[in-house]
């Protein structure tokens, strides 16, 4: 409640809509929002821009690089954000490879099983291989 009183959801919705989201109405109250792959990419682009241009960018990057969830894998450092709630198991990352790239993997899985983790890892390693970074 304290954070929401200082940073109301309406302000967040307006800020996020400036990213060029396909479905800004899905932001709801700033939590447990719906997300499509294109909008995940828009968020990653905004995060990347913030990291590169804002004085607090290095702090955000360091925080996102400390995330240790085992979903997206890479041989390179990553700034990542995962999401997990009923009916949604997602991970997205900025991969700092020689040819940097952004990757978002969204699923309707909600349990985080070994099979789910394997799926995320296989997809992310295929992307790394085909991105010309291996």
Predicted regions span which residues?
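Penicillin-recognizing serine hydrolase domain
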Residues: 1-134
């Amino acid at each position: 409640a304290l954070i929401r009183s200082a940073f109301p959801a309406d302000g967040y919705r307006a800020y996020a809509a400036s990213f060029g989201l396909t479905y800004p109405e899905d932001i709801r109250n700033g939590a447990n929002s719906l997300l499509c792959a294109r909008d995940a990419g828009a968020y990653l682009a905004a995060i990347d821009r913030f990291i590169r241009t804002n004085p607090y960018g290095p702090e955000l990057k360091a925080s996102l690089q400390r995330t240790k969830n085992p979903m997206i894998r890479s041989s390179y450092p990553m700034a990542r954000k995962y999401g997990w709630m009923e009916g949604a198991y997602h991970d997205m990352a900025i991969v700092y490879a020689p040819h940097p790239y952004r990757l978002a993997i969204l699923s309707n899985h909600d349990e985080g099983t070994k099979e789910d983790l394997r799926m995320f890892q296989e997809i992310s390693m295929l992307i790394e291989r085909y991105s010309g970074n291996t």
